[in-house]
């Protein structure tokens, strides 16, 4: 039996237990009685040795467990802080973007309200250009009182400086004078054309 004992059991058990298990009970009589005293003392020391070995192994496993838990807690803490920081950064970015958008929108609305709209100025400008072009675009003299001239020679241009268009009917003498000057110039033009022909 002693030769068949596994080596692992020999390494695990303390030497006192190995000595007691593998010792042969050959002593008898007085020898046995004399050996009981030191056996009792040896059993006490053996218990203390076993307790020390168990405490050492338990303490080593406990230290390993504590180290593993600490490492795991550190990893979890670092991941949680990273996620929290990331969420805060996202919230700050969203707030900044919203503030910039609100500022741009407010500035655009204020600028658009203060400046006049270009669509409203276009009709007045067109009216002014039309009023300016009306006296310039009349190269033909068309007095209201020159009916004979229109029947005899329609569409003849005025040679020389032509008088401006007649004023309203309130100023009748000035209109008559303008019509007479236009008639004189038209008559001179007719005479020149007849002589040349």
From Swiss-Prot:
Which residue stretches are annotated as topological domain Cytoplasmic?
A: 83-197
From start to end residue, where is composition biased (Basic and acidic residues)? 96-107, 125-136
Compositional bias of kind Pro residues: 162-171
Which segments sit on the Extracellular face? 24-61
InterPro entries xref list: C11orf87
The listed locations are: Membrane
- Write out the ranges of the annotated region (Disordered): 94-180
Q: What GO CC terms are in its UniProt record?
A: membrane
Question: Where does the secretion signal sit in this chain?
Answer: 1-23
| Keywords tagged on the record | Glycoprotein, Membrane, Signal, Transmembrane, Transmembrane helix
TM segment ranges: 62-82
Q: Where is the composition biased (Low complexity)?
A: 141-161
Please verify whether the record's keywords include Cell inner membrane: no
- Membrane topology, from the record: Single-pass type I membrane protein
Glycan-linked positions? 26
Which domain of life does the protein's organism represent? Eukaryota
- The main place the protein resides is membrane
Q: Which PANTHER family match?
A: CHROMOSOME 11 OPEN READING FRAME 87, SI:DKEY-183I3.9-RELATED
User: Which protein, by its recorded name, is this?
Assistant: Uncharacterized protein C11orf87
Annotated source species? Homo sapiens
Q: What is the lineage of its organism?
A: Eukaryota, Metazoa, Chordata, Craniata, Vertebrata
């Amino acid at each position: 039996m002693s030769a068949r004992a596994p080596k692992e059991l020999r390494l695990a058990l303390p030497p006192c237990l190995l000595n007691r298990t593998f010792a042969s009970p050959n002593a008898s009589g007085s020898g046995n009685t004399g050996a009981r005293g030191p056996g009792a003392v040896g059993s006490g020391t053996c218990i203390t040795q076993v307790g020390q070995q168990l405490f050492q192994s338990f303490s080593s496993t406990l230290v390993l467990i504590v180290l593993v838990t600490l490492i795991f807690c550190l990893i979890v803490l670092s991941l949680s802080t990273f996620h929290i920081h990331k969420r805060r950064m996202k919230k700050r970015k969203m707030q900044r973007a919203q503030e910039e958008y609100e500022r741009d929108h407010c500035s655009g609305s204020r600028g658009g309200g203060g400046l006049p709209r270009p669509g409203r100025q276009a009709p007045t400008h067109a009216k002014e250009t039309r009023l300016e072009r009306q006296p310039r675009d009349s190269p033909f003299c068309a007095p209201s009182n020159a009916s004979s001239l229109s029947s005899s020679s329609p569409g003849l241009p005025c040679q020389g400086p032509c008088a401006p268009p007649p004023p309203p009917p309130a100023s009748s003498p000035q209109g008559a004078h303008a019509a007479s000057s236009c008639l004189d110039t038209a008559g001179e033009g007719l005479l020149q054309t007849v002589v040349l022909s």
